[in-house]
């Protein structure tokens, strides 16, 4: 890499790297480093008895701060559990006559961000801080790019690494310098573990189903399309795993579940990412009433396991996941929040309702989609506390069993929390003839231009023809659940690496474009270092200023370039250029 492409700190760190190697120290050793203690455990188990034997420990971590005080140095080491202060003295680390390790390696070649391993004993400093008195230090990894320096005093953070776009793009840095971010993802793991335990205790089986599918079924969503070269067929990234899990119920499993990575080629916002994690579970011989009870019990259990309480604060709202939850039919919900009873309305009447309420709609939308739009625009945001919205119109639910008392409706519920859908569940449709008719209705919607209409999956219908027992299924958005339980209002905060727009890069002319103006190739990196990334930007400054900046960089970095004068720079600026 050209030295001019590096910051001053990066140059210093690379020089330190070279110095370590010259001293015979491998800055990236391959050997295992044995760790027998962690920061939080050391502090928790510290024995303050002055007469007790000093505890010997071996710890490793990243240097997060350092203070050099002549013959002594204090550093703060960050490991997987937290931070602890270490204390290094010249004569302890270098007991003989040769003090070079302390004077050169410790004082000059270590930087914030480096990984080191230290061995020593635990003690309490005169200031009362539990620390490790270092007797041996090993370099484990040299950081050649500086971390953002986040300062904290009296609980207040200064110079924080807080820009959202930077944090999401460089999550590895975010996790290092913002300790609360790691806590979010530790809680995420706890949520998954708690849910998995809840299912396993009841005898349900975790399974894996295909991510690449020939038919993107199980949900109304736009898929990502790819191509299998060997088979020469189009394939789709999974939008849902529902139809495969139901095939397993046909095959004789009483209860199956899967945590699946799903992909939907749709918009991104604070609650949607094109790649997300869902959990779907299907249990034979149950219905949606049973599943409502099961779902609220599950969520109450998860909250207690992860938080120790059922109450969660999201912004200014306090949400309580303690069962039971309120139950409201879709028709009742729309009537409650619009004053309009839509039961029995046809498509034309629903379009009039949309017009009256100011809900956008178009010709591709059928009856179910229109109702969905009304509910989404006028009702959904009002359900802050966990609420089951039940009994959806048949047109909205092509995979759901017809309601046992009203043929216009289906046995479906969605769990609304904080104004958003968290879970979706049915009494599953197991009539193969009815299922085919529902798929054909979806095909008609697709022909009208609805790109979220479901595909016909003939193999799934064939599976139903062999017989599927009465079954209830439930899907839950795991990312949204983690958002709720960690008090986050953006899905990007609970995804380690959320999808991002391409990173913006400043326009930069090539060496060939600079050459058109007579600028030698060796001067182009110098111009870039001076901030002149394009010929046009160079032309906008006075030739004297450009020349002075180039000469300063040439001298500072000892580049040894010659032949620069005011006349030359003026000629560069005046040369014809297109």
Swiss-Prot record:
Record-level GO BP terms: lysyl-tRNA aminoacylation
Alphabetical list of PROSITE patterns matching this protein: AA_TRNA_LIGASE_II
Binding site for Mg(2+) 2: 421
InterPro entries, per database record: Aa-tRNA-synt_II (IPR004364), aa-tRNA-synth_II (IPR006195), aa-tRNA-synth_II/BPL/LPL (IPR045864), Lys-tRNA-ligase_II (IPR002313), Lys-tRNA-ligase_II_N (IPR044136), Lys-tRNA-synth_II_C (IPR018149), NA-bd_OB-fold (IPR012340), NA-bd_OB_tRNA (IPR004365)
Record note on cofactor: Binds 3 Mg(2+) ions per subunit.
Residues of the signal peptide: none
Residues annotated as binding Mg(2+) 1: 414, 421
Compartments, record wording: Cytoplasm
UniProt similarity note: Belongs to the class-II aminoacyl-tRNA synthetase family.
HAMAP family in UniProt: Lys_tRNA_synth_class2 (MF_00252)
Record's protein name: Lysine--tRNA ligase
């Amino acid at each position: 890499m050209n030295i001019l492409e590096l910051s001053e700190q990066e140059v210093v760190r690379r020089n330190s790297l070279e110095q370590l190697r010259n001293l015979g120290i491998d800055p990236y050793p391959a050997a295992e480093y044995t760790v027998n203690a962690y920061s939080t455990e050391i502090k928790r188990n510290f024995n303050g008895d002055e007469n007790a034997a000093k505890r010997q420990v071996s710890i490793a971590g990243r240097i997060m701060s350092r203070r050099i005080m002549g013959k002594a140095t204090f550093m703060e080491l960050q490991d997987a559990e937290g931070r602890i202060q270490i204390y290094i003295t010249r004569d302890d680390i270098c007991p003989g006559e040769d003090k070079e390790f302390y004077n050169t390696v410790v004082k000059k070649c270590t930087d914030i961000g480096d990984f080191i391993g230290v061995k020593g004993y635990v003690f309490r400093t005169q200031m009362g801080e539990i620390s490790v008195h270092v007797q041996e230090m090993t370099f484990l990894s040299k950081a050649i790019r500086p971390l953002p320096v986040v300062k904290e005093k009296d609980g207040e953070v200064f110079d924080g690494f807080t820009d959202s776009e930077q944090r999401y793009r460089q999550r590895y840095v975010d996790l290092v310098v913002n300790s609360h971010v790691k806590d979010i993802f530790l809680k995420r793991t706890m949520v998954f573990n708690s849910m998995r335990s809840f299912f396993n205790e009841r005898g349900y089986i975790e399974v894996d189903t295909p991510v690449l599918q020939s038919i993107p079924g199980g949900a109304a969503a736009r898929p990502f399309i790819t191509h299998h070269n060997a088979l020469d067929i189009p394939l789709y990234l999974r939008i849902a795993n529902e139809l495969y899990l139901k095939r397993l119920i046909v095959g004789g499993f009483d209860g199956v579940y899967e945590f699946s990575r799903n992909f939907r080629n749709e918009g991104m916002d604070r609650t949607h990412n094109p790649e997300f994690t869902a959990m779907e579970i299907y249990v034979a011989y149950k219905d949606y009433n049973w599943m409502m009870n099961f779902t609220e019990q599950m969520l109450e259990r998860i909250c207690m396991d992860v938080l120790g309480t059922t109450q969660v604060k999201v912004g200014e709202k306090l949400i309580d996941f303690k069962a039971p939850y309120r139950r409201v039919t879709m028709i009742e919900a729309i009537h409650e929040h619009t004053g309009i009873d839509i039961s029995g309305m046809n498509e034309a009447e629903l379009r009039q309702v949309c017009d009256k309420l100011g809900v956008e709609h178009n010709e591709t939308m059928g009856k179910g989609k229109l109702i969905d739009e009304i509910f989404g625009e006028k009702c959904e945001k009002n359900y802050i506390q966990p609420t089951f919205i039940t009994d959806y119109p048949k047109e909205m639910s092509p995979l759901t069993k017809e309601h046992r008392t009203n043929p216009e409706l289906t046995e479906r519920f969605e769990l609304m929390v904080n104004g958003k859908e968290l879970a979706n569940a049915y009494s599953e449709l197991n009539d193969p003839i009815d299922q085919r008719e529902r798929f054909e209705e979806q095909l008609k919607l697709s022909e009208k231009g609805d790109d979220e209409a479901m595909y016909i999956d003939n193999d799934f219908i064939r599976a139903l023809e062999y017989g599927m027992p009465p079954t209830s299924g439930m899907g839950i958005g795991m990312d949204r659940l983690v958002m709720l339980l960690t008090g986050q209002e953006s899905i990007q905060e609970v995804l380690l690496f959320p999808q991002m727009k391409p990173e913006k890069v400043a326009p930069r002319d090539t060496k060939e474009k600079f050459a058109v103006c007579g600028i030698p190739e060796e001067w182009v990196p110098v111009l870039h270092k001076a901030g002149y990334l394009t010929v046009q930007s160079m032309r906008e400054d006075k030739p004297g200023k450009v020349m002075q900046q180039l000469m300063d960089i040439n001298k500072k970095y000892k580049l040894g370039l010659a032949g620069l004068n005011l006349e030359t720079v003026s000629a560069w600026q005046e040369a014809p250029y297109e």
